[in-house]
């Protein structure tokens, strides 16, 4: 059984998680109010996207443009990779063409399934990583990490 966004939306509804299914974008978005994390617009919001790439053989949860790369994108990526090394399940990806620094959690589903608990754990892990890693990118003094 491949993973589908319809199945994912059903699981989120059963867990009473408010979400938006973007049919055109082929993703589900879940918005969280955060304690410390600020998105690149300065809002205390994390927008997690759930996708089912490879014909539903994987479940992928991301926060796109999670952090601004800053003047030194390599240093920012390195700081986040160091933070990721201590965090199970969550990684960092950088798309230099569009300067998209994203947080990502993926699970291989193949012909198995994904439980509601597993899905919620992936979403929670990405959002909690954004909260915790905020200081890796923007230290307490407010300046970008170098």
Question: What is each stretch, according to the model?
Answer:
Residues 65-68, 107-112:
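A short interface-forming secondary-structure element
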Residues 57-100:
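Short, internal acidic amphipathic alpha-helical interface segments
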Residues 33-68:
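Long, continuous compositionally biased terminal/linker segments
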Residues 109-122:
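A short acidic/glycine-rich loop-to-helix N-cap element
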Residues 127-132, 136:
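Long, contiguous binding/interaction regions
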Residues 101-105:
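Short, aliphatic-rich beta-strand segments
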Residues 1-45:
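Charge-rich, low-complexity N-terminal segments
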Residues 137-146:
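Short, highly charged C-terminal tails/helix-capping segments
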